[in-house]
């Protein structure tokens, strides 16, 4: 029997394992991951130039280090953030609900700082972007405020996609000295009896007929966004208490570096938050990649979504970023993950299984984009196999209205942001909308079953997911 089983080798699961080792090397720990070892994680697009829909899982979204860590590698120093409100720090897309509920700000800062140092110890970039231009940043924040936007700033430690691979290879090698790791292994079920979780049922991702029961004293759900839909199903099957949270639906936006040069120089990533008329939904920019590349990722072997990469050595002439709208559903419909999957499925149909790309001006003028128009467009697409089309067929009036009005508002701060040749790729959706109810120890209503990271709706992003893993380990080390 294991002391701890961790389901998922993304940032939260990896950091749980790492910190448990620091606290007690004698604990018997098993880390289960449906994807590959990081040594086998390579996207074929790098050589072929197109997505081949890897089976049994996508190499971008699954495998050691998870989806967010493998795609770009930005560590947001939220403990040093500036929201414009004295004494308040920003804690990501869901504003750190768990942390704000249970911990004071100094404790939050300490755990983020500690987590950041772990990454530094394994070779993360020591330089922090966004610390050198205080006056210029304040001027941008002032312009944003005049346009009805909030510009949140925080230093960023940019590792880069290729360097992230090297860093997590070191972490994987370290963990293998002390714990067991099962790669290419799915957790098909949780073993729960009389309100107590006693273990897991696992199968090979290549042969689901071979089942194995593994017992443990404590089971940690660290399934990430890739596992959010799986976790929602398990919550339903086993009466694990959870509630629908917000789902973020939007697009990946691509525009020239020249337009973003000041923002890229001063901040590296600008986090604009808007509540534009008429709906006043929360809209935010996310995951900005200067001189980056638009990319695809496949979730649940079923839906193709947009993302973005930025490398330390390989550069384009474009900046890309996500523009995401937070939607909440209650009565009578309360299945945000299902809604998001349907949006993605419909847009994927329009793109024949690929992302759809449309010029911003064409969307405003009520027309689709054609291939020949992209060939002569001033903004050259960095994602070559996206299909020219019309995203308005699938994204929905409310979502598109929020996105369009946010782009126009940002254009007042960053002239050229609403240029008609800028490109919109769809869909980009973040699946962390099933919020699992937990206590301060991350424990669910099922005894000895814990939930951390993005998959359970607790966090959004690499650093906060990692910090939840550190905190989880500290709690378990005393049990």
What are these regions (language model features)?
Residues 1-88, 133-479:
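Residues forming the flavin
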């Amino acid at each position: 029997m294991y002391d701890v089983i961790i389901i998922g080798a993304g940032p939260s699961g990896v950091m749980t394992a790492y910190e448990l080792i620091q606290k007690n090397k004698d604990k018997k720990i098993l880390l289960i991951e449906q994807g590959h070892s990081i040594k086998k994680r390579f996207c074929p697009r790098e050589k072929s130039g197109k997505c081949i829909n890897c089976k049994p899982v996508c190499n971008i979204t699954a495998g050691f280090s998870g989806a967010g860590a493998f795609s770009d590698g930005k560590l947001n120093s939220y403990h040093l953030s500036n929201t414009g409100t004295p004494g308040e720090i920003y804690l990501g897309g869901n504003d750190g609900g768990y942390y704000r509920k249970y911990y004071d700000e100094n404790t939050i800062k300490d755990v983020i700082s500690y987590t950041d140092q772990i990454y530094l110890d394994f070779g993360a970039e020591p330089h922090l972007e966004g610390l050198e231009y205080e006056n210029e940043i304040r001027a941008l924040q002032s312009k944003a405020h005049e346009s009805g936007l909030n510009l949140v700033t925080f230093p960023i430690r940019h590792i880069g996609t290729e360097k992230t691979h090297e860093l997590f290879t070191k972490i994987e090698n370290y963990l293998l000295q002390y714990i067991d790791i099962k790669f290419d292994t799915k957790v098909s079920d949780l073993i729960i009896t009389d309100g107590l979780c006693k273990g897991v049922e696992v199968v090979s991702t290549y042969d689901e007929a071979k089942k194995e029961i593994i017992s443990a004293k404590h089971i940690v759900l660290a399934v990430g966004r890739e596992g959010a839909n799986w976790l929602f199903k398990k919550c339903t099957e086993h009466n694990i208490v959870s509630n629908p949270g917000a789902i973020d639906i939007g697009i990946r936006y691509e525009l020239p570096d020249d337009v973003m040069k000041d923002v890229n120089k001063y901040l590296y990533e600008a986090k604009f938050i808007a509540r534009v008329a008429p709906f006043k939904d929360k809209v935010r920019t996310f995951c900005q990649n200067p001189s980056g590349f638009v990319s695809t990722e496949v979730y649940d072997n079923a839906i193709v979504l947009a993302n973005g990469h930025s490398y330390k050595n390989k550069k384009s002439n474009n900046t890309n970023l996500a523009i995401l709208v937070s939607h909440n559903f209650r009565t009578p419909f309360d299945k945000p993950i299902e809604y998001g999957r349907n949006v993605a499925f419909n847009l994927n149909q329009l793109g024949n299984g690929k992302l759809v790309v449309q010029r911003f001006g064409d969307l405003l003028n009520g027309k689709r984009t054609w291939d020949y128009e992209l060939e002569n467009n001033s903004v050259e697409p960095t994602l070559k196999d996206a299909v020219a089309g019309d995203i308005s067929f699938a994204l929905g009036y409310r979502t598109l209205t929020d996105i369009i009005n946010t782009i126009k508002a940002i254009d007042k701060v960053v002239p050229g942001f609403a240029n008609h040749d800028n490109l919109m790729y769809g869909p980009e959706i973040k699946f962390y909308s099933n919020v699992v109810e937990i206590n301060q120890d991350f424990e669910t209503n099922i005894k000895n079953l814990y939930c951390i990271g993005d998959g359970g709706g607790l966090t959004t992003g690499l650093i906060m997911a990692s910090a939840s893993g550190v905190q989880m380990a500290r709690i378990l080390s005393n049990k």
